[in-house]
């Protein structure tokens, strides 16, 4: 939904997504540091990469850096200093999951996770119950949504996940699709 609202597809969202993920990651980490300042660092803090001064964004590879080189918009140096002083309250903070195939979020005004939608309207459920799910703002954005079956390659999806992974401290589960057209 967020990509459709911003007139982006998985193939051209990387810079905007990087900026959004910076804010998302920074906010979560900062909140954990504030909790650590108030209540103390988590018990396992000394055994984490956080204690080594490493942030999720520091774990990129040369391949990532050759694909994406976006400006950092936030003061990561100050956040790193706060972590060094107070620690973090949560050893693990940021997880992403694909979710489009399994989530059943209804009426929330959003789509189900980070992978593309399968269809604009879809039926999901178990053996005893089926429910229809309609993408948000269908009438206005129907031509803006990026459907998984519109992709003939996984490249854009994998690059999108790479941008997201840079700012998460846990591995992302990735579903890939193949449209043999």
Residue ranges and their predicted role:
Residues 37, 41, 58, 65-73, ...:
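Catalytic alpha/beta core of large soluble enzyme barrels
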Residues 1-63:
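Extended, well-ordered alpha-helical scaffold/bundle regions in very large, multi-domain proteins
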């Amino acid at each position: 939904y967020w990509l459709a609202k911003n007139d982006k597809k998985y193939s051209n969202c990387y810079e905007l997504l990087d900026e959004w993920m910076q804010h998302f990651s920074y906010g979560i980490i900062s909140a954990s540091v504030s909790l650590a300042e108030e209540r103390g660092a988590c018990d396992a803090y000394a055994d984490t990469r956080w204690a080594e001064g490493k942030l999720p964004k520091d774990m990129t590879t040369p391949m990532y850096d050759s694909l994406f080189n976006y400006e950092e918009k936030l003061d990561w140096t100050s956040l790193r200093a706060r972590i060094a002083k107070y620690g973090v309250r949560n050893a693990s903070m940021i997880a992403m999951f694909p979710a489009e195939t399994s989530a059943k979020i209804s009426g929330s005004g959003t789509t189900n996770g980070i992978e593309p939608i399968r269809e604009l309207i879809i039926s999901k459920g178990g053996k005893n119950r089926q429910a229809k799910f309609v993408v948000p703002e269908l009438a206005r954005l129907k031509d803006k949504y990026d459907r998984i079956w519109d992709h003939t390659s996984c490249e854009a999806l994998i690059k999108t996940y790479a941008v997201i992974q840079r700012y998460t401290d846990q591995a992302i589960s990735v579903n890939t699709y193949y449209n043999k057209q």
